[in-house]
UniProtKB/Swiss-Prot annotation:
Pfam families: Ribosomal_S15. This is Small ribosomal subunit protein uS15. Keywords: Ribonucleoprotein, Ribosomal protein, RNA-binding, rRNA-binding. It comes from Helicobacter pylori (strain G27). GO terms for biological process: translation. PANTHER family: RIBOSOMAL PROTEIN S15, BACTERIAL AND ORGANELLAR (PTHR23321), SMALL RIBOSOMAL SUBUNIT PROTEIN US15M (PTHR23321:SF26). Gene3D superfamilies: 6.10.250.3130, S15/NS1, RNA-binding. It comes from the Bacteria. One of the primary rRNA binding proteins, it binds directly to 16S rRNA where it helps nucleate assembly of the platform of the 30S subunit by binding and bridging several RNA helices of the 16S rRNA. HAMAP family: Ribosomal_uS15_B (MF_01343_B). GO terms for molecular function: rRNA binding; structural constituent of ribosome. InterPro entries: Ribosomal_uS15, Ribosomal_uS15_bac-type, uS15_NS1_RNA-bd_sf. GO terms for cellular component: cytosolic small ribosomal subunit. Part of the 30S ribosomal subunit. Forms a bridge to the 50S subunit in the 70S ribosome, contacting the 23S rRNA.
Amino acid sequence: MALNLEKKQEIIKAFATKENDTGSCEVQVALLNERIKLLTEHLKANPKDHSSRLGLLKLVAQRRNLLKYIKRTAHARYVVLIEKLGIKDR
């Protein structure tokens, strides 16, 4: 269910703004996006898992808030990020 270390490091490397960057908004959004994908697949197989559904909703809200922050502070970075992740602009 959780991201394995190799996948996580791959995502961090792809979205880091500088070397050893693990906490920037872009990296956080990319990691959340991957966790959301994994949880979505889990919920397709287990539709009655309501605690996981609640966790998914929390992750989506967290990603949405981070995306709003990036859009407000650095719109160019926001556009690049949503294109890379394949997320729709709201």
